[in-house]
Amino acid sequence: MSPPLELDYIGLSPPPPPPSSSSAAAARADDVDLKGTELRLGLPGSESPDRRPAAIAAAAATATTLELLPAKGAKRVFPDEAALTPPTAAAGKGKAAREGEEVGAEEEDKKVAAPPQPAAKAQVVGWPPIRSYRKNTMATNQIKSNKEDVDAKQGQGFLYVKVSMDGAPYLRKVDLKTYKNYKDMSLGLEKMFIGFSTGKEGAENQKDGEYVLTYEDKDGDWMLVGDVPWEMFTDSCRRLRIMKGSDAIGLAPRAGEKSKNRN
């Protein structure tokens, strides 16, 4: 830089000598340097007198091409499969994915909203309270015991049977196994009841006031005693009845037919 000029504001000192040509050239060079370092709007150095036009054009071209080229290491916007997948398939996949997400969200909401249900308690029935499974067990055992009793009675030929007589105000119960045949049973019943006979002979030769011994078999039919073998009678007899001879008419033929069918 040139040395500062001394100015005579009062007018006492003589005027300064004119600057030489060398000092003027140095001053112009300083002005050029200052102008190059000034702050301006625009590209740096675009107005610098020392910058060549070719360099300016190259810088401008580089600036425009940088915007079009991707950054180093950046990924492509779409994968290679996107170019090969048709738009409809891509749209379908996107819709299915959205629906799956919505369904999953709804299930999660239901799980959160619905509280866990308490365990169901066994039903209490009866008094005192008996739980249902115990009731079922008791019913099963009762049915089983009843079935065993029936089987035992059938196997033993209903050992004890009730004996009734028309006009008698009471019933009796006898054990058929204590008798060996019809005659023994008839003698035993005569001690309990009087005035009856057994078999077809008693039904055919009946008189007023005579009684006939009948029985009820497994099928619920009433038959005359003495029409079937003793063993068959003891196995099928359920009940004995001493009825009047007039009421026993018609039982003998049925008993004979049934005996033939069994044989």
Curated annotation (Swiss-Prot):
GO cellular component, one term: nucleus
Expression by tissue: Highly expressed in flowers. Expressed in roots and shoots.
Motif (EAR-like (transcriptional repression)): 39-43
Record-linked InterPro entries: AUX/IAA_dom, AUX_IAA, PB1-like
Pfam families: AUX_IAA
Location in the cell: Nucleus
Domain named PB1: residues: 158-245
GO biological process, one term: response to auxin
Xref: SUPFAM superfamilies: CAD & PB1 domains (SSF54277)
Keywords of the record: Auxin signaling pathway, Nucleus, Repressor, Transcription, Transcription regulation
UniProt induction comment: Not induced by auxin.
Function (record text): Aux/IAA proteins are short-lived transcriptional factors that function as repressors of early auxin response genes at low auxin concentrations.
Record-given protein name: Auxin-responsive protein IAA3
Source organism: Oryza sativa subsp. japonica
Gene encoding the protein: IAA3
